[in-house]
Amino acid sequence: MKAEFKAKFGAKSAAMRGTLGALAAALTGMAALTGAVVLGPNGSAGASEGSRLDPDLPAPAVEMSISRQPEDPGKAVNLTLDDGPDPTWTPKALEILAASGAKATFCMTGPNAQAHPDLVKKVVAAGHRLCNHSVSHDTAMDRKSVAYQGKEILDAKRMIDEASGGAELRYYRAPGGAFTPQSRQLAAAHGMRSLGWNVDPGDYRRPGADTILATVERQLANGPTILLHDGGGDRSQTMQALQNLLPRLKEQGYAFSFPQA
């Protein structure tokens, strides 16, 4: 009986290993076609962050790994605002930031920057930094071809550069954190370090200003880079939360920094 069980179990185990091996090979092949990587909840690419360079792409000019740590030593946060610029909410964000002496990184889509070059210039003039957030905000970019990813990144860079008058564009944030090794290499080759996040209160879902604030404070233990939005819809709740958040952060001894570039 024991020998029979062992024979049956061994056969099933071998078959299962074969099935899992085939599945892993298929997934690896699929990833190779698109450069896709499995991401964590904070825009992290896990082990793939140390992936090899693609010889068919230009060499990186800056660090390829995804940035989340602040430039400033000590207790600091990185405020980031996505999906703008927006003619209603970006000026409000600038006003709130100025009132607290805070700095932020604005992750702009190319078309929005192109439509509102005056706002792009105001962001730069106020001492904030710019980040490339692609052209079409395609959160499935990591499942598209490398050529598609490159066009999204470089077309957005051109639009933002033109809108800003050539201000430094230090970062690239993939929509939804849909980074690939190739997109990170392409961005780095053009001077943009990939930018992740640690804190995501889901403000784009409009859960209420108090909920946004409470979630940010709870998630700060995850790390210093806070993801908020100044574009893509009604951001009144985000602005209210930001207005309440900044004085609290200062009271708790946080400095306002920029992500390492």
Q: Model-flagged regions — what are they?
A:
Residues 1-78, 95-105, 222-261:
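Terminal accessory/targeting
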Residues 84-91, 114, 143, 147-150, ...:
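Soluble non-cytosolic domains of exported or imported proteins
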Residues 93-95, 120-122, 145-146, 186-189, ...:
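Short, glycine/charged-enriched secondary-structure capping and boundary segments
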Residues 94-107, 129, 146-177, 185-188, ...:
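CE4/NodB-like, metal-dependent polysaccharide N-deacetylase domain
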Residues 110-113, 136-140, 175-178, 200-203, ...:
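Short histidine/acidic/glycine/proline-rich micro-motifs that form metal-
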Residues 178-219, 253-261:
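His/Asp/Glu-enriched short active-site or ligand-binding loop at hydrolase and phosphoryl-transfer sites
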